[in-house]
Amino acid sequence: MIIKRSPQNPILKPLREHGWEAEATFNPCPAIKGKDIFLLYRAISMPHYHNLARNNIITSDIGIAQSKNGYNFFNRKKFIIPEKNWEQFGCEDPRVTKLNDKYFIFYTALSKYPFQADGIKVGLAISKDLKNIQEKHLVTPFNAKAMALFPEKINGQIWAILSVHTDKPPTKICLVSFNKESDIWSEKFWNNWYANFEKYALPLQRNKNDFIEVGTPPLKTKYGWLIFYSYIYNYFSPNRLFGIEAVLLDLKNPFKILARTEYPILTAEEYYEKIGLVPNVVFPSGAFIKNDWIYLYYGGADMVGCLALINLRIFLEEILKNDEKKPKLERFSHNPILLSRQENSWEKKAVLNPGAIYLNNKVHLIYRAISEDDVSTFGYAQSSNGYHIDWRSDQPVYIPRESFEKRDNPNVSCGCEDPRLTKIGNKIYMGYTAYDGHIPRIALTSINVKSFLNQQWQDWAKPILISPTDLNDKDMVIFPEKFQGQYLIVHRVGYDIDYSFSKNLNFGEGKWLEENRWIYCRPGWWDSKKLGAAAPPIKTKKGWILFYHGISENNVYRVGAVLLDLKNPIKILSRTSKPLLEPEMPYEKEGLVNNVVFPCGAVEINGKIFVYYGGADQVIGGATIDLNKLLQIFKTDKMY
């Protein structure tokens, strides 16, 4: 998704000299008045003695600040303070909408201390000029938060969105419509509505263990009402994840969901989102549109106010695009292209994860084969058109030769796994995972191109280990060119994709791959748990394409890609927001390891990219994508 944090972040910070906003200033919501932008925000005071609480507590007021540009704010002052008994312990999290020349400011009103669900309700302040408050009302007679009006009437009615039962889950994000303004604070109206509130809920929750809450007041676009909301994954777990998502509702019938994001567009990554009163929080609270850009305001770690910018046009195109129409890797119609052969003991159990290289107008595959007794070796196959296998070896072309790829216990697996092939000069380098039943490490060997083409497999060089001792390291690929006189090697220690530069390919005791963390997992996404490079990068006029596999929290393997700068490939230009390939076919969903697509090879032939992958750790499949279509995806998913 196209989103970038403001370099001025955090745009709103506590002021120690203002006791009422000395602890935190967050969850800001903007309102436009003339040429100025006013920001309403929650302000937390220094601890002080509260007569009604009979205790030293911190309290919340709602502040207001002014700006000419949306990120530099001045003239900060209190705006909404606890005055009524239904808000006597604090006013929190404002959401402001201008309707009929008045500013309707909904906020969380706290009436009880210690805080409890039946004392947490929605309050409303109405202002004509953002200087003074003309009216205040208690809105909901039940536990609710995060209410906001739509900025215009729909079918002659006033509409609003709110979160019901935020403090006694499950929470519902609901819609409500009013015939007249006074209905907004009518207790009778709300009691009738509340009796069947669940029928007014939007189905946004994916899992019963997740938590949702309204974020921004609705934004009108030509395609629909756009609302950003908080989606908290695994809310009741210590590993909960705060994310920001979005939904697009029909302009005339807001109950109709036109589109929504599949993954969070923002999670806590920056220090001001990770460190605060409540760590690791991003919480959307307000937005406006200017010059085709969405200015999205959010709270960071319940401490500061922040701003992110989103390209409106591209964002809407992305969430509205039908997944079936979006370019993806297209499987060969005759998949799987390689199966295990029961007559060959060395590949009887499975064939999978092929490396690929294009030489002399043929695609050459070196694939992993697993024997009955769980020893992995490499087989060979070739194709003249990239789609169909013309010939396949009857014997393994590479076997475990060194102690670091042989087992000392017959009850564990071992061998040579997951080959990747790169041609540099007149040599083909093959990196693979060497496994002795204890620690998987990266091994490197090579063979002369002529020997490879002549299938003189005895010419493979003696393999060497290039990853550190006692460190789990896998998924190694080498760039086919040097950069400033150095080789660039991609590998994986832990969960992210790493890189290492080396002046040469001579490794051994005292010289191992370095771990420079590079491409990270994206929390809440399809690649949230673990990443690994798939195939050696492909050079194009727009940059290097590096395919990778990503694993989700429910252990599904999918395929994505990044576009890297031609001269400085450490610089990531773009990353696919959606998977290019995911387990859908029976041979990908069921096997030795279910729900796996795992490429180790990719080649470009006449403007088309061929990707070769293992399916469910048992068979081999192929898929293609037009190079220009993939580059267009990268253009959409451009990173800032």
Q: Across the structure, where does each feature detected by a protein language model lie?
A:
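Beta-rich carbohydrate-recognition and catalytic domains
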Residues: 1-23, 27-89, 98-148, 152-210, ...
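Structural signature of WD-repeat beta-propeller blades
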Residues: 92, 147, 216, 285, ...
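Electrostatic interaction modules used in gene-expression and signaling proteins
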Residues: 287-289, 602-604
